[in-house]
């Protein structure tokens, strides 16, 4: 069944040419096509030349967006003893031990990110049914299994986020708000590109970057010139 495209989106699609845009031009177009009646996010959809069914072609890592995400995230921490108090002092919205594990097992998921200390991971791992479908299971690669709770909480609150390639090799990331300046969005998109390059899976063969599209939440897809993005040198802010 063909999905019906709204008249609004049809009009916006007319503004987008069937070509790859220079990064800054693409971001200006993203802002121009963010016309929904709510604050839209800036999305990146990046197709990579990897097959994640092979372990040496999986991509899961974190990126520190220099201009932040524009979102307020609720951080939960599972730890033991004094680490629970440390998490609360560092700004965790929710922190607990066995009692929090019990709440989550019963369906409590009122948070956007879960951090756990390594010593509680055997218990947290049993919450796969609750956490897995929402992408909330802590992982060392994602920076969410650590004893350094203060640093982790501060980084994620400031704009660090975890991402992964899905099973088709596509990375979907929100890299800011459409209300950000084009320059700020460019700084975030560049940080994302550099992180993906730096974490290229060892088993990736052939052409790594296949395509990059960006859009506002309710806007049309805009292709970004991959080579122009990778070659771009930004002055330090």
From Swiss-Prot:
PROSITE patterns tied to this protein: RIBOSOMAL_L1
Range of residues in the leader sequence: none
Protein name stated in the entry: Large ribosomal subunit protein uL1
Family to which this protein belongs: Belongs to the universal ribosomal protein uL1 family.
Gene Ontology molecular function: any one: tRNA binding
The protein's role, per its UniProt record: Binds directly to 23S rRNA. The L1 stalk is quite mobile in the ribosome, and is involved in E site tRNA release. Protein L1 is also a translational repressor protein, it controls the translation of the L11 operon by binding to its mRNA.
Subunit structure, as described in the record: Part of the 50S ribosomal subunit.
Gene: rplA
One Pfam family cited in the UniProt record for this chain: Ribosomal_L1
Cellular component terms per the entry's GO annotation: large ribosomal subunit
The species this protein was found in: Synechococcus elongatus (strain ATCC 33912 / PCC 7942 / FACHB-805) (Anacystis nidulans R2)
PANTHER family referenced in this protein's UniProt entry, alphabetically: 54S RIBOSOMAL PROTEIN L1, MITOCHONDRIAL, LARGE RIBOSOMAL SUBUNIT PROTEIN UL1M
GO biological process per UniProt: regulation of translation; translation
InterPro entries noted in UniProt: Ribosom_uL1_bac-type, Ribosomal_uL1, Ribosomal_uL1-like, Ribosomal_uL1/biogenesis, Ribosomal_uL1_3-a/b-sand, Ribosomal_uL1_CS
Keywords, comma-separated and alphabetical: Repressor, Ribonucleoprotein, Ribosomal protein, RNA-binding, rRNA-binding, Translation regulation, tRNA-binding
């Amino acid at each position: 069944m063909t999905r019906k495209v709204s008249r609004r989106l049809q009009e916006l699609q007319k503004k987008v040419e069937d070509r790859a845009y220079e990064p800054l031009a693409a971001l200006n177009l993203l802002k121009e096509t963010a016309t929904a009646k709510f604050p839209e996010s800036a999305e990146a959809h990046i197709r990579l030349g990897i097959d994640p069914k092979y372990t040496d072609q999986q991509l899961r890592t974190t990126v520190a967006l220099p201009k932040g995400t524009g979102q307020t995230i609720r951080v939960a921490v599972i730890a033991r003893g004094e680490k629970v108090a440390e998490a609360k002092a560092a700004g965790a919205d929710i922190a607990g031990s066995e009692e929090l594990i019990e709440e989550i097992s019963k369906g409590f998921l009122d948070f956007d990110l879960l951090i756990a200390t390594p010593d509680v991971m055997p218990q947290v791992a049993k919450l796969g049914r609750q956490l897995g479908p929402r992408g909330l299971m802590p992982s060392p690669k994602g920076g969410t299994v650590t004893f350094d709770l203060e640093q982790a909480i501060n980084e994620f609150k400031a704009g660090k986020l975890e991402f992964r390639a899905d099973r088709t090799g596509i990375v979907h990331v929100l890299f800011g708000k459409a209300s950000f300046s084009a320059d700020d969005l460019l700084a975030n998109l560049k940080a994302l590109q550099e992180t993906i390059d730096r974490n290229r899976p060892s088993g990736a063969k052939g052409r790594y970057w296949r395509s990059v599209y960006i859009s506002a939440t309710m806007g049309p897809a805009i292709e970004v010139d991959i080579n122009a993005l990778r070659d771009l040198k930004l002055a330090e802010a």
